[in-house]
């Protein structure tokens, strides 16, 4: 076959291969449609009803559920809790994760084992993790009070304390997911060329100066990824709270996710639960978008 014939043959076949690729998008598009778009639309419609979640009979109530949401004092208390979990977990996961990454990026003998130990809690179910810590903090027979008893200290009911249990939840969430932040930061650190540090040392820059002038600016993409992921995960925290306190005492440790669960299954108030769900979705969307925009701008400024 001549060169011209081969060229013509290739040109005829190539468009057919390209045109067939759109079929590959169908499974992903169907998954998004069935598991994301349809539930969101259905949930939005439920917010305009007084459906109890089980009966086939319900009434359209217009915007009554939204009026109820904004006038309900529980909404704002639980929003404050949710922001506490989301922003608190994000702060501690990133600070501790970065410290772990800086330490384990050094040439130390046990760094492989230490990385595994730090990352191991990520592989445990959040619900199981919550029950593990429940048995540690439990008032009756908990490991913490047994330890305090050895030193003659009176037992404390930490999980029933409205001032303590939100911080315990943040601590557990940080402990479980700090390994993800560490891995992302390690990847970012290992992508920084060593030539930059060698040049800085030759110029007499100390380690602190190298961190703020080289490491931190070049880690900004990793920081952006971690911040956004941690905020989204923290704002929809559910399993650990259910295992530890079930949102109690009262609504002291409720998050928006656990409050929705409580409304739907315990109070049989599906219309209001769906309204809280839509509200939570917009809170997460707005905060994560603002965080992404802010840190993307910081990336540009520090590059």
UniProtKB/Swiss-Prot annotation:
Q: What induces it?
A: Repressed by the transcriptional regulator MelR. Induced by melibiose and raffinose.
Q: Any transmembrane segments, and where?
A: 21-41, 83-103, 117-137, 167-187, 210-232, 275-295
The record's listing under Gene3D superfamilies reads: MetI-like
In the record, biological process GO terms are: polysaccharide transport; transmembrane transport
**A cellular component annotation (GO) from this entry:** plasma membrane
Q: How does it sit in the membrane?
A: Multi-pass membrane protein
Give the location in the cell. Answer: Cell membrane
- Supply the alphabetized keyword list: Cell membrane, Membrane, Polysaccharide transport, Sugar transport, Transmembrane, Transmembrane helix, Transport
ABC transmembrane type-1 domain residues are: 79-291
> Chief subcellular site?
membrane
Spell out the Pfam families in the cross-references. BPD_transp_1 (PF00528)
State what the entry records as the consequence of deleting this gene. Deletion of the gene abolishes induction in the presence of melibiose and raffinose.
Functionally, this protein is described as follows: Part of the ABC transporter complex MelEDC-MsmX involved in melibiose, raffinose and stachyose import. Probably responsible for the translocation of the substrate across the membrane.
- Which PANTHER family does this one have? ABC TRANSPORTER PERMEASE PROTEIN (PTHR30193), INNER MEMBRANE ABC TRANSPORTER PERMEASE PROTEIN YCJO (PTHR30193:SF37)
Question: Hey, which family's this protein in?
Answer: Belongs to the binding-protein-dependent transport system permease family.
State the oligomer form and interacting partners: The complex is composed of two ATP-binding proteins (MsmX), two transmembrane proteins (MelC and MelD) and a solute-binding protein (MelE).
Q: Give the protein's recorded name.
A: Melibiose/raffinose/stachyose import permease protein MelD
Q: Which organism is it from?
A: Bacillus subtilis (strain 168)
List the taxonomic lineage: Bacteria, Bacillati, Bacillota, Bacilli, Bacillales
Gene coding for it: melD
